[in-house]
Curated annotation (Swiss-Prot):
UniProt name for this protein: Ribosomal RNA small subunit methyltransferase H
Gene name per UniProt: rsmH
Function in brief: Specifically methylates the N4 position of cytidine in position 1402 (C1402) of 16S rRNA.
Family according to the record: Belongs to the methyltransferase superfamily. RsmH family.
Documented EC number(s): 2.1.1.199
Matching InterPro entries: RsmH, SAM-dep_MeTrfase_MraW_recog, SAM-dependent_MTases_sf
């Protein structure tokens, strides 16, 4: 299957990096390589880009799509939470800009055998890379009802989490749940008819929650952002695109902490803790897709872009 993916907030996110022709940049979520291609087009012959993705299909796609930049593009098949280690191994001490696009690629969603989508019946999987050992199928069939409800409530923010978990456990006692279609049917049965008539697909939040749990997405996000900011040169920029409120809240709070790290009581006339701001926040409010973009790519509707700049410290 061809690796198809429409890059979200493409120009806004790359404009936010303020590309320097001879700079070094990192695309931490290579995906369909659309953002990487735009960065490389703006770089001069001395500029370099490191592309990180744990999905072998994304790495293979990028190798083909970006082959016109052989000396400038370097692909790394790893999880982006290892950015500090990756740059150290490449003998790169500082970079000019870093991009994160935290959405699941259209390719992953539209490839049934990856088991990400509630729109295609396939084996339950949801692992983004070979390093993940536990699949969604194992979570759904093996963990307790309480743990399942916690995952759906915490990562999916689904009001019916407890009821969905109860229905899943009831069904798996009869037979194991193997496919996305089987899970969708259980969720539809669990969610009351009235609630199903409104809002998104009833399985959307549960599938999101399982994907986040399988890939440990949120647990590593805050520290990854801090490591990324540490890797930036003074004046370097970081652009982060999120697709749901949990991710956006983590990025927002981490940026706020890095921009104002002082822990002194409000009554103190001057700072005594000695903690210095590391960044300035460029986007007071997140940038969202235009109407034109949403017409061409409805999947972009929940995207939010936040940008920050490293201070001279």
């Amino acid at each position: 299957m061809e690796f198809k993916h429409v890059s979200v907030l493409l120009h806004e996110s790359i404009d936010g990096l303020k590309i320097k022709p001879g700079g070094i940049y990192v695309d931490c979520t290579l995906g369909g390589a659309g953002h990487s291609l735009e960065i490389l087009r703006r770089l001069g012959p001395e500029g370099k880009l490191v592309g990180i993705d744990q999905d072998p299909a994304a790495i293979a796609n990028a190798a083909e799509k970006l082959q016109e930049f052989p000396g400038q593009f370097h692909a790394v098949q790893r999880n982006f939470f290892q950015i500090k280690q990756i740059l150290r191994e490449m003998a790169i001490s500082e970079v000019d800009g870093i991009l994160f696009d935290l959405g699941v690629s259209s390719y992953q969603l539209d490839t049934p055998e990856r088991g990400f989508s509630y729109m295609h019946d396939a084996e339950l999987d949801m692992r983004m890379g070979p390093d993940q050992t536990i699949s969604a199928k194992e979570l759904v069939n093996d963990i307790s009802e309480e743990e399942l409800a916690t995952i759906i409530r915490r990562y999916g923010e689904d009001r019916w989490a407890k009821r969905i978990a109860s229905f899943i456990v009831k069904e798996r006692k009869k037979r194991a749940i193997h496919t996305t279609g089987e899970l969708v049917d259980i969720i539809k049965a669990a969610v009351p008819v009235g609630a199903r008539r409104e809002g998104p697909h009833p399985a959307k939040r549960t599938f999101q929650a399982l994907r986040i749990a399988v890939n440990n997405e949120l647990e590593i996000l805050e520290q990854t952002m801090k490591d990324a900011v540490t890797a930036l040169k003074s004046g370097g920029r970081i652009s982060v695109i999120t697709f749901h409120s949990l991710e956006d809240r983590i990025i927002k709070d981490t940026f706020k902490e890095l921009a104002n790290p002082c822990t002194c009581p409000p009554a103190f006339p001057v700072c005594a803790c000695g903690k210095q701001p590391q960044i300035k926040i460029v986007t007071g409010k997140p940038i969202q897709p235009s109407k034109e973009e949403l017409e061409h790519n409805p999947r972009a509707r929940s995207a939010k872009l936040r940008i920050a700049e490293k201070l001279n410290i």
